[in-house]
Structure formats: C-alpha cells, structure tokens
Amino acid sequence: MAIILGVDPGSRITGYGVIKCVGRQQVYVGSGCIRTSSDELPLRLKQIFDGLSEIIRQYQPDEFAIERVFMAKNADSALKLGQARGAAIVAATAANLPVAEYSATQIKSAVVGTGRAQKTQVQHMIQQLLKLPSAPQADAADALGVAVCHYHTSQSLVALAGRANVRTYGRYK
C-alpha cells in the first residue's frame, strides 16, 4: 500500500491531492488547495512550503508527484510558477520523499485518455475514478490527476521491470 501526494503548483493557488493505492485500486484520501495571500512572492513561496509541509505531516505520503510546467502566459508568470514548484519540491525533499515530475499531457493522458483534455474532463474523470460524490475543485482535481498519473506510471514500470529478465524462445523480451 502506497500513499501518493500529487501537487498542481501555482504561485496563487497550489492544489494537492492524496490517494492510497491498495493493489490495483486507487482510493481517495484527501485534497484541497493552498491559497496564498497577496503578499510579496517570497512570503507566498513560504506559505506554499509551510502548507505542503503540514500536508506531508498530516497524510504521511510515501511518494510525491508534481506537474512539470513547460510554458506560461508570459515570462514573469513562468518564473513565478517555477519558484512555486521549487517551494513544493523542497517541502517534499525536506521530508525525504522521492519526487516524480509529469507533464500536463502525460497527466491528462493517464486520467482522460487524451493529452488534449479540458479541465472539466479531468474533473469528471477524477470524480469517476476515485468514486467521489461530486467533482473536486479544478486545482485539487489536477493534483489528484498528478497522483493518479504517478500511480499508473509506476505500475507500468513495475510491470516492465518484472518482465525485463523473462526469457522467451532464447531471447530477452
């Protein structure tokens, strides 16, 4: 049984989602958003770090996954988003958690089946996959999507590793 913390970083709103993996089943544990104040960026980064550190203490995850960001609306936004990701990653590494990163396309593909899915489609599929009574808030749904993507990716790697040394007809497969 593994507990995965997924994070959708943002300098104003950082979503988080926690799932527990029992066998091949993913079970919802918790989710929400860290909403930073309108203070200067260094204080917002500290709020992200402190908020995720508390979530890590509360849920005791085994693994940490975060969305990798490739582009933003402008250079300033991209820099702030990168710094928010850094604050989140430092919170994870301070707790000795392994960190995995996934692109938005990978996450959407794992959750919806297409890398071009809309936010509402991700919310709907997260609700269905985790058997939630209602669709989670967009940032929390994205974070849960990161956790689900990490689960599926790690399961695929485990399956591949298990077959890596299987000999079939005199060749490795």
UniProtKB/Swiss-Prot annotation:
Binds 2 Mg(2+) ion per subunit. Mg(2+) 2 binds at E67. It is an enzyme of class 3 (hydrolase). Keywords: Cytoplasm, DNA damage, DNA recombination, DNA repair, DNA-binding, Endonuclease, Hydrolase, Magnesium, Metal-binding, Nuclease. Mg(2+) 1 binds at D8, D139. The keyword Lipoprotein does not apply. The keyword Magnesium applies. It comes from the Bacteria. CDD domains: RuvC. GO terms for cellular component: cytoplasm; Holliday junction resolvase complex. It catalyses: Endonucleolytic cleavage at a junction such as a reciprocal single-stranded crossover between two homologous DNA duplexes (Holliday junction). InterPro entries: RNaseH-like_sf, RNaseH_sf, X-over_junc_endoDNase_Mg_BS, X-over_junc_endoDNase_RuvC. Pfam families: RuvC (PF02075). GO terms for molecular function: crossover junction DNA endonuclease activity; DNA binding; magnesium ion binding. GO terms for biological process: DNA recombination; DNA repair. Its EC number is 3.1.21.10. The active site is at D8, E67, D139. Its cofactor is Mg(2+). It is found in: Cytoplasm. NCBIfam families: PRK00039.2-1, ruvC. The RuvA-RuvB-RuvC complex processes Holliday junction (HJ) DNA during genetic recombination and DNA repair. Endonuclease that resolves HJ intermediates. Cleaves cruciform DNA by making single-stranded nicks across the HJ at symmetrical positions within the homologous arms, yielding a 5'-phosphate and a 3'-hydroxyl group; requires a central core of homology in the junction. The consensus cleavage sequence is 5'-(A/T)TT(C/G)-3'. Cleavage occurs on the 3'-side of the TT dinucleotide at the point of strand exchange. Homodimer which binds Holliday junction (HJ) DNA. The HJ becomes 2-fold symmetrical on binding to RuvC with unstacked arms; it has a different conformation from HJ DNA in complex with RuvA. In the full resolvosome a probable DNA-RuvA(4)-RuvB(12)-RuvC(2) complex forms which resolves the HJ. Belongs to the RuvC family. This is Crossover junction endodeoxyribonuclease RuvC. It comes from Shewanella pealeana (strain ATCC 700345 / ANG-SQ1).
